[in-house]
Protein backbone atom coordinates (compact mmCIF):
# COMPACT_ATOMS: atom_id res chain seq x y z
CA UNK A 1 0.00 0.00 0.00
CA UNK A 2 3.02 2.28 -0.40
CA UNK A 3 2.91 5.68 -2.09
CA UNK A 4 5.95 7.39 -3.62
CA UNK A 5 5.42 10.73 -5.35
CA UNK A 6 7.89 12.37 -7.72
CA UNK A 7 6.84 16.02 -7.88
CA UNK A 8 9.58 16.92 -10.35
CA UNK A 9 8.26 14.75 -13.18
CA UNK A 10 4.63 14.54 -12.03
CA UNK A 11 4.48 10.81 -11.43
CA UNK A 12 3.75 8.44 -8.58
CA UNK A 13 4.37 4.80 -7.73
CA UNK A 14 1.76 3.02 -5.62
CA UNK A 15 1.15 -0.48 -4.33
CA UNK A 16 -2.09 -2.26 -5.27
CA UNK A 17 -3.29 -2.12 -1.66
CA UNK A 18 -3.23 1.66 -1.58
CA UNK A 19 -6.68 3.16 -0.96
CA UNK A 20 -8.13 5.87 -3.17
CA UNK A 21 -8.51 8.24 -0.23
CA UNK A 22 -4.94 7.68 0.93
CA UNK A 23 -3.57 8.53 -2.50
CA UNK A 24 -5.81 11.58 -2.82
CA UNK A 25 -4.70 12.92 0.58
CA UNK A 26 -1.02 12.43 -0.24
CA UNK A 27 -1.42 14.23 -3.56
CA UNK A 28 -3.46 17.07 -2.06
CA UNK A 29 -0.52 18.04 0.15
CA UNK A 30 1.49 18.63 -3.02
CA UNK A 31 -1.32 20.24 -5.06
CA UNK A 32 -1.30 17.25 -7.41
CA UNK A 33 -4.20 15.17 -8.67
CA UNK A 34 -5.12 11.73 -9.99
CA UNK A 35 -8.60 10.50 -11.02
CA UNK A 36 -9.03 8.31 -7.95
CA UNK A 37 -12.19 6.39 -7.11
CA UNK A 38 -15.12 8.35 -5.68
CA UNK A 39 -15.12 6.38 -2.41
CA UNK A 40 -12.24 6.64 0.07
CA UNK A 41 -11.90 2.91 0.78
CA UNK A 42 -11.70 1.63 -2.81
CA UNK A 43 -8.46 -0.27 -3.38
CA UNK A 44 -6.46 1.28 -6.20
CA UNK A 45 -5.20 -2.06 -7.56
CA UNK A 46 -8.60 -3.37 -8.58
CA UNK A 47 -9.82 0.10 -9.50
CA UNK A 48 -6.99 0.64 -12.00
CA UNK A 49 -7.24 -2.83 -13.55
CA UNK A 50 -11.00 -2.40 -14.01
CA UNK A 51 -10.53 0.84 -15.94
CA UNK A 52 -11.31 3.32 -13.22
CA UNK A 53 -13.97 5.97 -13.82
CA UNK A 54 -12.75 8.36 -11.14
CA UNK A 55 -12.92 11.99 -10.17
CA UNK A 56 -12.50 14.37 -13.11
CA UNK A 57 -12.20 11.50 -15.61
CA UNK A 58 -13.94 13.58 -18.26
CA UNK A 59 -10.97 15.97 -18.14
CA UNK A 60 -8.06 13.72 -17.15
CA UNK A 61 -9.21 10.46 -18.73
CA UNK A 62 -10.01 7.14 -17.09
CA UNK A 63 -7.66 6.12 -14.32
CA UNK A 64 -6.23 3.28 -16.43
CA UNK A 65 -5.34 5.79 -19.15
CA UNK A 66 -3.06 7.47 -16.62
CA UNK A 67 -1.18 4.26 -15.79
CA UNK A 68 2.21 4.68 -17.48
CA UNK A 69 3.82 1.51 -16.19
CA UNK A 70 3.38 -1.58 -14.05
CA UNK A 71 5.65 -3.99 -12.21
CA UNK A 72 4.07 -7.40 -12.59
CA UNK A 73 4.83 -10.97 -11.53
CA UNK A 74 4.06 -13.43 -14.34
CA UNK A 75 2.82 -17.01 -14.02
CA UNK A 76 6.39 -18.37 -14.05
CA UNK A 77 7.35 -16.13 -11.13
CA UNK A 78 9.27 -13.62 -13.23
CA UNK A 79 9.06 -9.97 -12.16
CA UNK A 80 8.97 -7.65 -15.17
CA UNK A 81 8.36 -3.98 -15.80
CA UNK A 82 5.92 -2.95 -18.52
CA UNK A 83 5.52 0.47 -20.11
CA UNK A 84 5.09 1.90 -23.61
CA UNK A 85 8.64 0.80 -24.55
CA UNK A 86 9.06 -2.63 -22.96
CA UNK A 87 6.54 -5.41 -22.48
CA UNK A 88 3.97 -2.97 -23.79
CA UNK A 89 1.44 -5.73 -24.45
CA UNK A 90 1.23 -6.25 -20.68
CA UNK A 91 0.54 -2.57 -20.10
CA UNK A 92 -2.12 -2.66 -22.82
CA UNK A 93 -3.79 -5.65 -21.17
CA UNK A 94 -3.63 -4.12 -17.70
CA UNK A 95 -5.70 -1.12 -18.79
CA UNK A 96 -9.11 -2.65 -18.23
CA UNK A 97 -8.45 -6.40 -17.93
CA UNK A 98 -9.91 -6.51 -14.44
CA UNK A 99 -9.78 -9.87 -12.61
CA UNK A 100 -8.85 -11.60 -15.87
CA UNK A 101 -5.39 -10.01 -15.97
CA UNK A 102 -2.73 -12.71 -16.36
CA UNK A 103 -0.27 -11.55 -13.74
CA UNK A 104 0.03 -10.03 -10.28
CA UNK A 105 0.70 -6.30 -10.36
CA UNK A 106 2.88 -5.32 -7.41
CA UNK A 107 3.36 -1.67 -8.36
CA UNK A 108 1.60 0.89 -10.54
CA UNK A 109 3.36 3.89 -12.09
CA UNK A 110 0.96 6.81 -12.53
CA UNK A 111 0.87 10.07 -14.45
CA UNK A 112 -0.29 12.94 -12.24
CA UNK A 113 -2.05 16.23 -12.99
CA UNK A 114 -2.18 19.71 -11.45
CA UNK A 115 -4.85 19.80 -8.76
CA UNK A 116 -8.00 21.78 -9.57
CA UNK A 117 -8.10 24.89 -7.39
CA UNK A 118 -11.85 24.76 -6.86
CA UNK A 119 -14.07 21.74 -6.24
CA UNK A 120 -17.77 22.41 -5.87
CA UNK A 121 -21.24 20.91 -6.07
CA UNK A 122 -24.49 22.13 -7.59
CA UNK A 123 -27.59 20.25 -6.43
CA UNK A 124 -31.22 20.23 -7.50
CA UNK A 125 -33.91 17.85 -6.22
CA UNK A 126 -37.16 16.84 -7.94
CA UNK A 127 -40.12 14.75 -6.90
CA UNK A 128 -40.38 11.40 -8.66
CA UNK A 129 -43.40 12.53 -10.65
CA UNK A 130 -41.04 14.71 -12.70
CA UNK A 131 -38.78 11.78 -13.59
CA UNK A 132 -39.57 11.57 -17.31
CA UNK A 133 -39.20 15.32 -17.82
CA UNK A 134 -35.88 15.41 -15.98
CA UNK A 135 -34.49 12.44 -17.91
CA UNK A 136 -35.53 13.98 -21.23
CA UNK A 137 -33.85 17.26 -20.27
CA UNK A 138 -30.67 15.48 -19.14
CA UNK A 139 -30.53 13.52 -22.38
CA UNK A 140 -30.77 16.76 -24.34
CA UNK A 141 -28.19 18.84 -22.46
CA UNK A 142 -25.80 16.03 -21.48
CA UNK A 143 -23.59 16.06 -24.61
CA UNK A 144 -22.85 19.77 -24.16
CA UNK A 145 -22.05 19.73 -20.44
CA UNK A 146 -18.52 20.93 -19.66
CA UNK A 147 -15.91 18.16 -19.15
CA UNK A 148 -15.22 19.78 -15.78
CA UNK A 149 -18.65 18.61 -14.57
CA UNK A 150 -19.64 15.11 -13.45
CA UNK A 151 -23.34 15.24 -14.36
CA UNK A 152 -25.17 12.73 -12.15
CA UNK A 153 -28.71 11.74 -11.28
CA UNK A 154 -29.41 9.72 -8.15
CA UNK A 155 -32.62 8.20 -6.81
CA UNK A 156 -32.76 8.77 -3.07
CA UNK A 157 -35.64 7.68 -0.85
CA UNK A 158 -34.73 10.44 1.62
CA UNK A 159 -33.99 13.19 -0.88
CA UNK A 160 -36.95 15.24 0.32
CA UNK A 161 -37.04 14.10 3.92
CA UNK A 162 -37.72 10.84 5.71
CA UNK A 163 -39.67 8.41 3.49
CA UNK A 164 -39.94 11.00 0.73
CA UNK A 165 -38.42 9.68 -2.48
CA UNK A 166 -36.78 12.08 -4.88
CA UNK A 167 -34.43 12.46 -7.81
CA UNK A 168 -31.21 14.32 -7.10
CA UNK A 169 -29.56 16.12 -10.01
CA UNK A 170 -25.96 16.59 -8.95
CA UNK A 171 -23.13 18.38 -10.69
CA UNK A 172 -19.77 18.03 -8.96
CA UNK A 173 -17.39 20.41 -10.72
CA UNK A 174 -13.58 20.68 -10.67
CA UNK A 175 -12.06 23.86 -12.09
CA UNK A 176 -9.41 26.47 -11.30
CA UNK A 177 -11.83 29.14 -10.06
CA UNK A 178 -15.29 29.62 -8.58
CA UNK A 179 -16.24 31.73 -11.61
CA UNK A 180 -15.30 28.94 -14.03
CA UNK A 181 -17.25 26.45 -11.92
CA UNK A 182 -20.28 28.74 -11.86
CA UNK A 183 -20.23 29.00 -15.63
CA UNK A 184 -19.82 25.22 -16.02
CA UNK A 185 -22.94 24.44 -13.95
CA UNK A 186 -25.04 27.32 -15.31
CA UNK A 187 -27.03 24.83 -17.41
CA UNK A 188 -28.82 23.73 -14.23
CA UNK A 189 -29.95 27.26 -13.37
CA UNK A 190 -31.00 27.77 -16.98
CA UNK A 191 -33.04 24.55 -17.10
CA UNK A 192 -36.68 24.98 -18.16
CA UNK A 193 -37.50 22.58 -15.32
CA UNK A 194 -36.05 24.75 -12.56
CA UNK A 195 -39.51 25.91 -11.45
CA UNK A 196 -40.50 22.28 -10.84
CA UNK A 197 -37.55 21.59 -8.54
CA UNK A 198 -38.43 21.09 -4.88
CA UNK A 199 -34.97 22.21 -3.86
CA UNK A 200 -32.15 24.08 -5.60
CA UNK A 201 -28.91 24.79 -3.76
CA UNK A 202 -26.33 27.34 -4.88
CA UNK A 203 -22.89 26.23 -6.02
CA UNK A 204 -21.10 25.07 -2.87
CA UNK A 205 -17.39 24.38 -2.32
CA UNK A 206 -16.75 20.83 -1.10
PLM ranges: what are they?
Residues 1-122, 126-129:
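FAD-binding core of FAD-dependent oxidoreductases
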Residues 70, 75-206:
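C-terminal cap/substrate-recognition region of VAO/PCMH-type FAD-linked oxidoreductases
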Amino acid sequence: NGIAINEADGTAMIGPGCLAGELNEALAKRRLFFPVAHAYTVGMGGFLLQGGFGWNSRTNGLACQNVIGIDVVLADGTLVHANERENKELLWAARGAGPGFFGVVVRFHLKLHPRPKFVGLKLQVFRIRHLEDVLAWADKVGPDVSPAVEFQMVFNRKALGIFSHGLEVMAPVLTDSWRAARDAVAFINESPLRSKASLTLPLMPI
